[in-house]
Design a protein with these regions (language model features):
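Extracytoplasmic soluble-region selector
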Residues: 1-51, 55, 170
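Residue-level detector of short, conserved catalytic/binding motifs and their immediate flanks
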Residues: 9, 232-235, 547-548
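Primarily short, surface-exposed interaction patches in extracytoplasmic proteins
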Residues: 37-111, 116, 124-501, 538-540, ...
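Residue-level detector of conserved, well-ordered beta-strand and adjacent loop positions
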Residues: 25, 254, 528
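A short, structural micro-pattern
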Residues: 5, 18, 247, 482, ...
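Long, His/Glu/Asp-enriched segments that create or flank divalent metal/ion-associated functional microenvironments
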Residues: 489-553, 559, 563
Length: 572
């Protein structure tokens, strides 16, 4: 191994299932050890970042100005530019704790819940092209409910582990709820009766009923991406030479995902089929009309539900567990499978019969799933266990990346032995602190934003000018698609409209629920809004492009926003 220049990296040694990263540091200056300048480290984050910078001989940039801080924090926390009046008041304020106070204020604004619900929808893959289309709410209605649920949980500051529990263990019915009661409740959401909100219910079943999330292998891939920040695609057919996961690991892990299914037309229990048909009759729907089915039927049901009538809905629930096999019966089945005389069709039938009876969490031991009511409960318990190396690190790394445009592990969705963190002590501090503070999302935002590390200026010095991974300075970054789109609208709006947009987020792009093939917003597309379609954080692009420049200088939408009645220019 030959060093080509100063900096830090890892040398990865691997053999079979063993993967060991070895950190390597070549100081960028002679300012190491006793030669390193005294550095103020007011927070644990600052001290852990400084520990790495001291080894590198890298001196961090100065803390940014008040104006830079306010703009940065407002955009990052709420997805919103600070209004002029707020900026002027903040710059006049001489309080020594005004930055901390501003962070607390921003975390209570509507923009915080709107923007971070959108980011959680990115990571959980809320795409209106892929969500369930086999129910009256339709794809867009389901996508709206998904965002509404996320927004409500973020606004309530529900602990992250409870948000995840509501997704992982999701089912359509509440405990003890009959099919009729379930349909009445869902119909009330479409009718918006008495302020009924889908966000009030404990579960998010749409996560499990996506069109590209039905097969066990699809669910294994998506689950690992969303909640663990782990890529296991390669292990579907082979062991990647730089990763630890084998095909056997993948096959055993996917067995957790066999038993969540979608029930249409009251088909979950035998006696509910008649309830479904009676419901259609009560709605004056001809059940013998063969042309009235599929989307045509669902659109009619949606119209009736909006008018306040109770209509039947599709539901998601785990199937019944398989009965346990005796050792003798299992041995007999295996003997048949391994027999040279068995026909292929019979062999496949027996293999399907055995499938899903055992499963293994990533890096764990084999578990029996026979007679387990819901295998997802085992998955959740494993993720929330303190010894789990992925769950807490995955979310704190993603949130960190949102603030710095680079993760402690980069890419943020690739936690693996061959892709180690740039600062493992920092990642572990945040993950452990997140657990100890009961998975409080606002604790995490607060801890990051109050650090000098987050508040560094962008101006580099000779020691950190080439470093964009050790957090010694703020790295210039483009605003996300939704944020820049809203910023342009606010900047071109008249004073009253601009103030209203800053405080009312429902019509803002940061609260957009139309991600997918039915979203025809050209501006959001060219600025890289997440497509939410490939189990990869790279679905969102932060790269600049020529099309973005052309849009800002010459697009009709842009020119109309400047010249329209009520714009800032019109007011002048």
């Amino acid at each position: 191994v030959t060093a080509k220049g100063p900096g830090d990296s890892h040398v990865v040694a691997f053999y079979d299932n063993g993967v060991v990263p070895v950190p390597v540091i070549f100081p960028v200056s002679n300012k190491t050890g006793s030669e390193y300048p005294d550095l103020k480290t007011p927070t644990p984050i600052d001290e852990l970042v400084a520990m790495k910078l001291r080894k590198l001989g890298e001196v961090p940039s100065e803390v940014c100005s008040d104006g830079e801080f306010l703009r940065r924090a407002s955009l990052d926390i709420t997805g919103t530019l600070p209004p002029v009046a707020e900026t002027e008041a903040f710059l006049r304020d001489t309080s020594p704790n005004k930055r901390d106070a501003k962070i607390e204020e921003l975390l209570e604004r509507p923009g915080y819940a709107a923007w971070w619900a959108t980011k959680l929808c990115d990571w959980t893959m809320n795409n209106n092209r892929n969500v369930n289309n086999n129910s009256p709410e339709g794809r867009q209605g389901a996508s709206n409910f998904w965002y509404e649920w996320m927004h409500k949980k973020v606004a309530q500051n529900l602990p992250y582990d409870e948000i995840v529990e509501g997704i992982v263990l999701a089912k359509s019915r509440l405990d003890g709820e009959s099919y009729t009661e379930f349909c009445e409740r869902m119909s009330s959401y479409l009718a918006n009766e008495d302020g009924q909100s889908f966000g009030d219910q404990p579960y998010l079943p749409y996560f499990w009923s996506r069109q590209d999330f039905k097969k066990p292998e699809e669910r294994a891939l998506g689950f690992a991406y969303t909640f663990l920040g782990v890529r296991i695609q390669c292990a579907q057919c082979h062991k990647h030479p730089f990763d630890q996961w084998t095909k056997d690991d993948f096959d055993r892990f996917k067995n957790f995902f066999n038993r969540v299914t979608e029930y249409r037309n009251g088909s979950r229990f035998p006696d509910e089929k008649s309830i479904y048909k009676q419901m259609l009759v009560s709605l004056n729907i001809d059940t013998t009309d063969k042309d009235l089915k599929g989307n045509k039927l669902y659109r009619l049901l949606k119209t009736k539900a909006i008018k306040g009538e109770t209509v039947p809905f599709t539901e998601v629930a785990p199937t019944k567990p398989k009965p346990a096999l005796t050792k003798e019966k299992l041995a007999g089945i295996m003997e048949q499978i391994n027999s040279s005389d068995i026909k292929q069709k019979k062999k496949e039938q027996l293999e399907r019969f055995l499938e899903g009876r055992t499963a293994t969490v990533l890096g764990g031991k084999e578990m029996k799933l026979e007679e387990v009511e819901d295998p997802r409960e085992i998955l959740l318990a494993w993720m929330l266990d303190e010894s789990n190396p992925y769950f807490s690190q995955a979310i704190v790394n993603r949130v960190w990346s949102s603030y710095f445009n680079v993760g402690i592990v980069e890419p943020p969705d690739d936690l693996s032995l061959a892709n180690p963190p740039s600062n493992p002590e920092l990642l572990e501090y945040l993950a452990q602190g997140f657990r100890e503070n009961n998975f409080d999302m606002k604790w995490l935002h607060r801890e990051i934003c109050k650090s000098d590390t987050y508040q560094r200026g962008w101006q580099p010095n000779e020691t950190n000018i080439h470093d964009d991974r050790n957090f010694g300075r703020a790295v210039a970054r483009r605003m996300p698609a939704e944020v820049i789109y809203d910023a342009v609208r606010i900047a071109t709006a008249g004073d009253r409209e601009a103030m209203e947009m800053c405080s009312v987020v429902e019509k803002r792009a940061i609260a957009d629920t139309t991600v997918g093939s039915y979203n025809n917003d050209y501006a959001l597309e060219i600025f890289g809004q997440s497509t939410r379609e490939s189990n990869c954080d790279c679905d969102r692009s932060m790269e600049p492009s020529l099309l973005q420049t052309v849009f800002l200088q010459n697009d009709k939408e842009m020119l109309d926003s400047i010249s329209r009645r009520g714009s800032w220019l019109d007011e002048l």
